[in-house]
Amino acid sequence: MGTLLRDGATLRITDTGEGLAVVFQHGLGGGEAQAGQTFPAGFRRITLECRGHGDSGLGERRPFSFEMFADDVLAAADQAGLDRFVAGGGSMGAAIALRLACRHPQRVAGLILVRPAWIFTAAPGNMQPIAEVAELILEHGTDKGRTIFARSETATRLYHQAPDNLSSLFGYFDRPDAKAFAQVLANIAADGPGISERDAAALDIPALVIGNEVDAVHPLSTAYTLAAAIPDAVFAEIRPKARDSVGHFSELRTQIAAFLQSHSKVRSLIPS
């Protein structure tokens, strides 16, 4: 474990494993444990817990944004001595990785996008449930906000269509730092990676995009769209976490490991 100081925030960094270096970021509300559960053994993984996540502080700057989080991650890569690395992550982490690849092509040698939730625009419709939860916490607090949300049309719809998403949304009300973290939720749900379809089309690196069905926050269509937009992307559909969590993570790690192994001898992927 290491730390990085940014704008008054002490950010926690994990640097574990050996071999090909992959900067792999967690999703919104996640942290090191989530990244570790997703990533296969046999490679070097660097994960920065974004501001307000895990053991990382919130810092002084507002609003929270993908630009902020991506700049923090790049600073962590600098501190780790990585000139060139594979960038990846799940959900929010995928959007951070995509931004890094498009904005810093000289630094990113490969791309892994797991269950992406953003394409190119800010505040996509699939982020509406998270924005709704954030607003309820900020306006009503956790107890009353949870009660209101439980009776909402959004909760009813997700109960039938994407129960795993609903469980994650209720988890935001249970966080000990729920009130403070709600601002992170609100800001990130309203933001976007800040890149265009043209930026994605210009990428000239190996890329893996992974998606699954039964997920309203991370639509399979989002993964399809990104895979089609990136010239050298490989698309993989895995079993939904909502139906088989163990199988989901097993297939996820297998896909990532196969991608990294298949490109481990490619000169452009070897960190300099």
Enumerate the predicted regions with their spans:
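Catalytic active-site module of serine/aspartate enzymes centered on a nucleophile-bearing elbow/loop
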Residues: D232-S272
